[in-house]
């Protein structure tokens, strides 16, 4: 084709050049014949030139196409190599993230008699160092190290001196939540397997599970929701979970079985050494890690989380659990057996089992595209209950004499407590979030919320009324933020933050005063924090 175009192109140009000479020796019948010849020759010249240009362009296009095909093949090979490198890097390296918060808290307390206590300036630092590793698409390792410490302070156990007094700062359930020393502690560490069995996506996980900052609590805490429902569970523990997605039947439906262990009854390594009679040496006479009689029984927990519906805007979640062999402070021996009215020692003993349950509903976005404000508004409501099952077998002493049955929350009967919780989170003009919350607890209400992020005790455990308002504001994108929070609790009964024994006995303020006590009736915490996350 290209050769034909070249011939026609050259021939037409020759005709145009020599046509004037040729027509001098020819005769034309009319001037019109002469013009027709000229037009014909010009047309041939134009068409041949255009045809030649099209063919040349086609040749260039063909050459470029071949070059592009070669480049695409090289690019595909490069992309494959880059993917292999990225996959190798992801599998060979643990990825870290940092969450560092500096807080100021102003604490105010008022007792039933009107006595006031305060701390005008409690400063603290909290560090969460997260880590993750995904060797395959269905297997993930997750971990988080934590440090939470008051400025310049050390825990009692650090030096043996009571720099901050006695307490339960190092109790395992809250060791990373309460103010402690300057050591990094393992707050979370677990593996997560996400297989698909049949057509059902599943999850299986074992380790120190993410059991604080759960559902709905995460809104105020400005975090992604963790596994448990925050109305009843907010504490650290070791355990396992197995879940299945039932989304093919109902939108967002899923079921998860949860198991946990809050304490292990086992003696320590080389726990006892007695002097041997035959040889002059110390010899261990008790095997390692066996069960120890008289100590707290192993504390276990079993339950489930069932989400019947969740479409991203409307969601309902339910949970039930039982805590086995939960502990409580019970009356021990008298400090003066000869005087029945003398003070009695409180001992931590196993007191029974505890059931808990909750149902929570959340609306994330009011209406359907009415306006941005309603689209970003979140409303929620939650109802929960707790039921005691006392053992009634541990003997203890009271000012009235020996009693053969230890109480559970001050009662030898099974008691039921209830709580409801309402909240709203609203967007503001500065890109932040403004929240309001209210909760109420009854006389025998007792959740497992010891790890709640407050300095005045768990507001969700309050036997009375709690009010809270907060403003969370991003300062530098999603990397640096601040929050101002006000929490106010008015207790109707004592024992809100106690364990499950006599120390958790509910009494009205007047009943407690009649027994010579002066319990806290009102508490408030004003908090300001700045938080860096990357």
Give the positions of each predicted feature.
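Surface-exposed loop and membrane-interface regions of Gram-negative outer-membrane beta-barrel proteins
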Residues: 103-126, 132-201, 211-231, 344-349, ...
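N-terminal periplasmic/intermembrane-space "pro-region" immediately following the signal or transit peptide
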Residues: 11, 18-23, 28-32, 36-116, ...
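C-terminal structural cap/anchor segments
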Residues: 405-476
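Outer-membrane beta-barrel "beta-signal"
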Residues: 518-534
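Transmembrane beta-strands of outer-membrane beta-barrel pores
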Residues: 102-108, 147-151, 208-212, 246, ...
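Membrane-embedded beta-strand positions of outer-membrane beta-barrel proteins
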Residues: 98, 143, 204-206, 255-257, ...
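Signature for the C-terminal beta-barrel architecture of outer-membrane proteins
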Residues: 197-203, 219, 223-428, 434, ...
């Amino acid at each position: 084709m290209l050769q034909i175009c070249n011939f026609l192109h050259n021939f037409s140009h020759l005709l145009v050049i020599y046509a004037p000479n040729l027509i001098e020796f020819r005769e034309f019948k009319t001037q019109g014949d002469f013009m027709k010849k000229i037009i014909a020759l010009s047309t041939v010249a134009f068409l041949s030139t255009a045809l030649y240009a099209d063919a040349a362009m086609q040749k260039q296009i063909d050459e470029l196409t071949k070059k592009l095909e070669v480049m695409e093949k090289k690019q595909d090979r490069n992309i494959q190599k880059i993917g292999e490198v990225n996959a190798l890097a992801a599998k060979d390296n643990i990825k870290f993230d940092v969450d560092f918060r500096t807080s100021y808290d102003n604490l105010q307390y008022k007792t039933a008699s009107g006595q006031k206590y305060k701390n005008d300036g409690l400063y603290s630092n909290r560090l969460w160092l997260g880590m993750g590793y995904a060797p395959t698409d269905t297997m993930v390792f997750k971990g988080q190290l934590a440090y939470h410490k008051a400025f310049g302070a050390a825990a009692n156990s650090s030096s043996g001196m009571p720099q901050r007094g006695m307490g339960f700062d190092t109790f395992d359930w809250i060791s990373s939540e309460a103010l402690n020393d300057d050591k990094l502690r393992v707050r979370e560490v677990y593996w997560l397997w996400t297989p698909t069995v049949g057509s059902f996506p599943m999850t299986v996980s074992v380790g120190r599970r993410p059991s604080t900052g759960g559902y709905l609590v995460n809104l105020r805490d400005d975090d992604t929701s963790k596994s448990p429902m925050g109305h009843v569970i907010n504490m650290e523990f070791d355990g396992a979970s197995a879940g299945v997605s039932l989304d093919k039947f109902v939108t967002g439906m899923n079921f998860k079985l949860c198991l946990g262990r809050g304490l292990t009854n086992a003696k320590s390594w080389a726990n006892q050494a007695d002097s041997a009679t035959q040889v002059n040496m110390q010899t261990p006479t008790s095997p390692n890690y066996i069960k120890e009689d008289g100590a707290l029984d192993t504390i276990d927990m079993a339950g489930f989380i069932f989400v019947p519906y969740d479409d991203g805007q409307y969601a309902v979640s339910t949970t039930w659990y039982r805590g086995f062999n939960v502990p409580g402070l019970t009356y021990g021996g008298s400090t003066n057996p000869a005087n029945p009215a003398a003070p009695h020692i409180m001992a931590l003993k196993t007191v029974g089992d505890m059931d808990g349950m909750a149902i929570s509903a959340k609306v994330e976005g009011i209406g359907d595209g009415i306006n941005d404000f309603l689209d970003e508004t979140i409303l929620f409501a939650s109802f929960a209950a707790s039921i005691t099952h006392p053992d009634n077998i541990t003997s203890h002493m009271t000012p009235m004499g020996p009693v053969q049955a230890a109480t559970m929350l001050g009662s030898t009967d099974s008691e039921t407590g209830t709580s409801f919780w309402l909240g709203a989170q609203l967007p503001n003009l500065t890109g932040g979030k403004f929240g309001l919350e209210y909760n109420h607890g009854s006389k025998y209400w007792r959740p497992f919320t010891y790890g709640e992020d407050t300095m005045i005790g768990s507001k969700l455990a309050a036997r009375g009324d709690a009010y809270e308002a907060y403003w969370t504001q991003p300062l530098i994108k999603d990397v640096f933020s601040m929050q101002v929070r006000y929490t106010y609790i008015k207790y109707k009964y004592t024992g809100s933050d106690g364990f499950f024994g006599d120390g958790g006995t509910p009494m009205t303020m007047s009943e407690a005063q009649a027994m010579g006590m002066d319990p806290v009736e009102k508490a408030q915490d004003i908090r300001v924090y700045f938080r860096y996350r990357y």
